């Protein structure tokens, strides 16, 4: 039995919801990278990435526990146990990519690094087309929008790469560009497990819980190797204890953006959801240029090139994202879901309910374990918060408050619509 058809009105609702989730993801993913500016305070980029991943780990277990409960996470993975391996693999790819972004920010700054690693959208589009039938039967208008958008993104990335080289040393520019592009390739490939999970009926909140095991495990291994052993790593963590709170918070903020991104991928696909969430490049430019003054001291032509490059990439992202799937293309998604169901012997109702944004199982009450997770995460933030000191960074507070306010408004709006339409399914 194949997954049944979804009513056209329901499809349109879920696709509008996916677009909203992608926009909110961009805002929160952009804000989460701001604490990475701390690398200029003398912290190792690997240490920064490790502590952020610790915050990610806390967020990936506590937010699903509060929203649905870990019992429903367990129920989902009993339906599709093969996705545990895919989730952990995706987490490993993310950990390496995130570490590369810290190096890129250190060498290039937020304003330049963001658009470069957002070439992950091009990789994501390729995998979506090759493996999951995205854009098949989409028509020439949608194909033109997606391919034209990809060309715009690539051109904008080239402009930003060129302008970056004139304001940092040659070696730093080369290393930063390589790190940013490497992160883009890894993140683009990471979306294969995402799409497999959601075509199989998996709830995004369940998938990210096991995803983070791969993240933390891989990041711990990378940190111990790069820094020089567990004892050296522990010593550096103690020396940076006054900054741990901010980096944990950055990881937690990143989780919020990533969860929105997961819902975007689920409801509008990799080839559209990832480019839309990559609007974080604009947030990165706003935070870097306006809140931190990264472009201060640059010449007029250099600033103009940075802005033109970002706008060009944003135009490409908009072209791709506005090319919403039509009925014939959506049918290809259903066929891809059927292939996943047959390949792994999944329950047809579980897959069908997932495609419709519904739960195949009744809601369950929160357990004592759920509240223990929330309490442990809260304790970690309180403990590190007592030792925290404000980083010695120049910050335009008016801009920071305005950007934060917009992000909070997007968060509230998206959560309300997600709850009303899907009950977080």
Predicted regions and their residues:
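Polytopic alpha-helical membrane proteins, predominantly small-molecule transporters/carriers
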Residues: 1-425
């Amino acid at each position: 039995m194949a997954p049944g058809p979804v009513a056209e009105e329901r499809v349109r609702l879920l696709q509008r919801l996916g677009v909203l989730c992608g926009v909110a993801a961009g805002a929160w993913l952009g804000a989460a990278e701001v604490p990475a500016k701390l690398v200029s305070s003398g912290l190792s980029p690997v240490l920064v990435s490790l502590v952020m991943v610790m915050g990610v780990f806390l967020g990936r277990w506590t937010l699903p526990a509060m929203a649905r409960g870990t019992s429903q996470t367990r129920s989902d993975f009993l339906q599709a146990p093969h996705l545990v391996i895919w989730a952990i693999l995706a987490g490993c790819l993310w950990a390496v990519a995130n570490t590369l972004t810290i190096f890129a920010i250190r060498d290039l700054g937020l304003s330049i690094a963001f658009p470069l690693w957002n070439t992950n959208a091009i990789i994501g589009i390729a995998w979506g087309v090759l493996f999951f039938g995205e854009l098949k039967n989409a028509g020439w208008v949608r194909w033109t929008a997606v391919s034209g958008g990809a060309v715009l993104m690539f051109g904008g990335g080239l402009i930003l790469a060129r302008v970056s080289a004139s304001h940092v040393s040659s070696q730093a520019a080369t290393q930063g560009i390589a790190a940013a592009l490497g992160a883009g390739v890894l993140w683009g490939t990471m979306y294969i497990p995402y799409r497999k999970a959601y075509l199989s009926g998996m709830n995004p909140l369940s998938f990210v819980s096991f995803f983070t095991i791969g993240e933390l495990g891989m990041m711990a291994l990378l940190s111990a190797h790069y820094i020089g052993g567990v004892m050296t790593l522990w010593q550096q963590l103690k020396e940076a204890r006054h900054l741990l709170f901010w980096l944990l918070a950055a990881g937690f903020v990143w989780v919020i953006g990533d969860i929105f991104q997961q819902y975007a991928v689920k409801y509008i696909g990799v080839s559209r959801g990832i480019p839309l969430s990559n609007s974080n490049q604009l947030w990165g430019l706003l935070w870097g240029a306006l809140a931190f003054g990264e472009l201060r001291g640059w010449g007029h032509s250099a600033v103009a090139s940075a802005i033109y490059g970002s706008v060009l990439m944003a135009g490409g992202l908009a072209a791709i994202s506005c090319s919403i799937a039509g009925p014939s293309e959506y049918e290809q998604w259903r066929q891809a879901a059927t292939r996943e169901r047959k390949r792994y012997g999944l329950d047809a109702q579980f897959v069908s309910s997932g495609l419709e944004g519904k739960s195949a199982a009744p809601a369950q009450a929160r357990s004592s374990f759920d509240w223990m997770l929330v309490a442990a995460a809260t304790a970690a933030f309180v403990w590190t918060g007592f030792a925290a000191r404000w980083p010695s960074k120049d910050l335009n507070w008016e801009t920071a408050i305005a950007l934060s306010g917009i992000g909070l408004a997007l968060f509230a709006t998206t959560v309300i619509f997600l709850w009303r339409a899907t009950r977080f399914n």
